Design a protein with these regions (language model features):
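Conserved Nudix-box catalytic region and its N-terminal flanking loop in Nudix hydrolases
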Residues: 1-22, 64, 71-76, 80, ...
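Nudix hydrolase/Nudix homology domain
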Residues: 37, 45-48, 53, 73-130
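Active-site-adjacent beta-strand/loop module that shapes the phosphate/pyrophosphate-binding cleft
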Residues: 44-66
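Recognition helices and adjacent regulatory flanks at domain boundaries
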Residues: 22-23, 30
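Active-site micro-motifs of SAM-dependent methyltransferase domains
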Residues: 26, 62, 92
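An acidic, carboxylate-rich microenvironment
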Residues: 15-18, 34, 89
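A short coil-to-beta-strand element that immediately follows conserved catalytic motifs
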Residues: 31-38
């Protein structure tokens, strides 16, 4: 089994939330009304300044292709196969050692913990001050 979070590639000058919104639409065809930060991590602190923000997008709405601003899926985006997987199943796959992507694990376990707390501790989806 392979599972990954959407990993937006920054466009120069684009805010992280704007990038996440654009990538969600381009790669899945969905738009979200509700965005929060699940995690803010450095992959390799001490050796890299690469910062990864993991967002939670909720209240999703399907956007017909005709309304997607002319984006045409190419390369890997055209090959993506989306499916809904219950969160508890994904957690079980990580705990069983079936899944290994570190950033995806951070996101999965963060949303699992947030859901157990009723999503009350989530932060606004804005870039934290550096």
């Amino acid at each position: 089994m392979q599972l990954r979070l959407l990993v937006p590639r920054d466009a120069p000058g684009e805010e992280p939330l704007v990038t996440a919104e654009r990538e969600l639409l381009e790669e899945t065809g969905y738009r979200a009304r509700d965005w929060h930060v699940l995690a803010d991590v450095f992959n390799t602190p001490g050796t890299s300044r690469e910062r990864v923000l993991v967002f939670l997008a909720r209240d999703l709405t399907w956007v017909p292709e005709s309304e997607r601003a002319g984006f045409v899926p190419r390369h890997e985006e055209a090959q993506l196969q989306l499916r809904w997987v219950p969160l508890t199943d994904v957690v079980s796959h990580f705990l069983a050692g079936d899944l290994h992507n570190g950033i995806t694990a951070v996101g999965v376990f963060a949303v699992h913990a947030a859901r157990q707390g009723g999503f009350t501790a989530l932060r606004e989806a804005v870039l934290p001050q550096r």
